[in-house]
Amino acid sequence: MHIDTRYVTRYNINMIKSFAHKGLKEFYESGSKKGIQPEHAPKLGRMLDRLDASTSPQDMNLPGYRLHPLKGDKQDMWAVTVNGNWRLTFYFEGQDAYLVDYQDYH
């Protein structure tokens, strides 16, 4: 069978490519709250859905998320506020998010 590629639609899907936090990855993939603060689950779910659909850090600049770049040895990374001192951190390479982490870094 031969497919004429002139008529094939190609999709370039941007997405979260990697996680630094095992519990966050499990929450994202299965909904399990065992590796995260359970009270953060609703907001984390919204943030991860948004991040998965984002093509740049600026797509995460929503009211209440407090998007900000990190400094020092993490200068290529960005953070959004989950609750209190808890942050969702990530960096973009091209239009994909990498090393998505969930941490209390203050």
Residue ranges and their predicted role:
Residues 30, 50, 54-57:
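Short hydrophobic alpha-helical module
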Residues 46-49, 68, 88:
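N-terminal, well-ordered alpha-helical segments
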Residues 1-13, 71, 78-106:
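Enriched for short, Lys/Arg-rich terminal
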Residues 17, 63, 98:
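Residues that recognize and position ribonucleotide moieties
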Residues 55-78:
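A short, surface-exposed loop/turn module that caps and links secondary-structure elements
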